[in-house]
Amino acid sequence: KSIPDAVILAFNTLIVKNWNGLASAFKQSDVIAYIASDNITEEEAIKNHWLDVEPIYRANGFGVKYVGRGSDAEFTFWKA
Protein backbone atom coordinates (compact mmCIF):
# COMPACT_ATOMS: atom_id res chain seq x y z
CA LYS A 1 0.00 0.00 0.00
CA SER A 2 1.43 3.36 -0.96
CA ILE A 3 1.75 6.22 1.51
CA PRO A 4 -1.37 8.43 1.46
CA ASP A 5 -1.04 12.02 0.25
CA ALA A 6 -2.26 13.21 3.67
CA VAL A 7 0.81 11.67 5.33
CA ILE A 8 3.22 13.26 2.84
CA LEU A 9 1.43 16.59 3.31
CA ALA A 10 1.85 16.25 7.09
CA PHE A 11 5.60 15.70 6.74
CA ASN A 12 5.99 18.54 4.22
CA THR A 13 4.03 20.92 6.46
CA LEU A 14 6.04 19.98 9.55
CA ILE A 15 9.36 20.27 7.68
CA VAL A 16 8.48 23.83 6.62
CA LYS A 17 7.02 24.79 10.01
CA ASN A 18 10.10 23.58 11.92
CA TRP A 19 12.79 24.65 9.43
CA ASN A 20 15.58 26.61 11.17
CA GLY A 21 17.59 27.43 8.06
CA LEU A 22 19.66 24.25 8.25
CA ALA A 23 17.33 21.46 9.28
CA SER A 24 13.89 20.59 10.57
CA ALA A 25 13.20 18.35 13.57
CA PHE A 26 9.88 17.21 14.99
CA LYS A 27 8.38 14.32 16.92
CA GLN A 28 6.51 11.39 15.44
CA SER A 29 3.59 12.43 17.67
CA ASP A 30 3.41 15.71 15.70
CA VAL A 31 2.88 13.72 12.50
CA ILE A 32 0.24 11.54 14.16
CA ALA A 33 -1.62 14.62 15.43
CA TYR A 34 -1.57 16.17 11.96
CA ILE A 35 -2.83 13.08 10.10
CA ALA A 36 -5.55 12.47 12.70
CA SER A 37 -7.49 15.30 11.04
CA ASP A 38 -7.66 13.06 7.95
CA ASN A 39 -9.04 10.18 10.05
CA ILE A 40 -5.78 8.23 9.89
CA THR A 41 -5.02 6.59 13.22
CA GLU A 42 -1.56 6.01 14.67
CA GLU A 43 -2.21 2.26 14.61
CA GLU A 44 -3.18 2.36 10.92
CA ALA A 45 -0.16 4.50 9.97
CA ILE A 46 2.28 2.22 11.79
CA LYS A 47 0.68 -1.04 10.62
CA ASN A 48 0.85 0.10 6.99
CA HIS A 49 4.38 1.59 7.35
CA TRP A 50 3.08 4.99 6.25
CA LEU A 51 5.59 6.79 8.50
CA ASP A 52 8.51 5.12 6.73
CA VAL A 53 9.03 8.14 4.48
CA GLU A 54 12.83 8.27 4.63
CA PRO A 55 13.44 6.72 1.16
CA ILE A 56 11.03 9.20 -0.48
CA TYR A 57 12.77 12.23 1.00
CA ARG A 58 16.27 10.84 0.40
CA ALA A 59 15.36 10.31 -3.27
CA ASN A 60 14.37 13.99 -3.37
CA GLY A 61 17.60 15.45 -2.00
CA PHE A 62 17.06 15.34 1.76
CA GLY A 63 19.04 13.72 4.51
CA VAL A 64 16.80 12.05 7.08
CA LYS A 65 17.47 10.77 10.58
CA TYR A 66 14.96 8.92 12.75
CA VAL A 67 15.86 8.50 16.42
CA GLY A 68 13.89 6.87 19.20
CA ARG A 69 10.82 4.71 19.43
CA GLY A 70 7.11 5.32 19.41
CA SER A 71 5.49 8.73 19.68
CA ASP A 72 8.61 10.22 21.35
CA ALA A 73 10.73 9.36 18.30
CA GLU A 74 12.06 12.31 16.35
CA PHE A 75 12.55 12.92 12.64
CA THR A 76 15.25 15.30 11.42
CA PHE A 77 15.41 16.45 7.78
CA TRP A 78 18.10 18.54 6.06
CA LYS A 79 19.11 19.32 2.49
CA ALA A 80 21.69 16.70 1.51
Regions found by a protein language model. Give the residues of each.
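C-terminal edge-of-domain segments
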Residues: 56, 61-80
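An N-terminal amphipathic alpha-helical segment
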Residues: 1-43
